[in-house]
Amino acid sequence: MDQLIQLVEATQERNDIPEVRPGDTVRIQLKVIEGEKERLQAFEGVVIGDKGAGTSKTITVRKISHGVGVERIIPVNSPNVESITVVRNGKARRAKLFYLRKRTGKAALKVKERKTASAQA
């Protein structure tokens, strides 16, 4: 039974999604259906945690909108996710960045930048 589940999940998993880690700033294009129309809605924020693996992986993204903190839990393999783009690589020393919830203003999104191999070359 376990092999059957793994086989089905392997066919359902998306390969076009980049590796996202806590601390990264990402821009996610989500499909939104309003009546008969379908449009894309961008959501840009800091990844404060991830959960699960494979087809059930989710990421929690936080942004500040008009002075109010907004968090969305986004299933990575959802058909409503058009694309995920990493805007900035962040350096986090823990897996869950829930301490950002207590911060206000610019400090609420402040995470040090991670140096990547491509940036150093």
Swiss-Prot record:
GO cellular component: cytosolic large ribosomal subunit
Gene Ontology annotations of biological process type: translation
Coiled-coil intervals: none
UniProt superkingdom: Bacteria
InterPro entries per the UniProt record, alphabetical: Ribosomal_bL19, Ribosomal_bL19_CS, Ribosomal_bL19_sf, Translation_prot_SH3-like_sf
Residues spanning the membrane: none
Alphabetical UniProt keywords: Ribonucleoprotein, Ribosomal protein
Family annotation (Gene3D superfamilies): 2.30.30.790
Molecular function via GO: structural constituent of ribosome
NCBIfam families reported in the protein's UniProt record: rplS_bact
Family from the record: Belongs to the bacterial ribosomal protein bL19 family.
Role played: This protein is located at the 30S-50S ribosomal subunit interface and may play a role in the structure and function of the aminoacyl-tRNA binding site.
Name this polypeptide is given: Large ribosomal subunit protein bL19
Species for this entry: Chlorobaculum parvum (strain DSM 263 / NCIMB 8327)
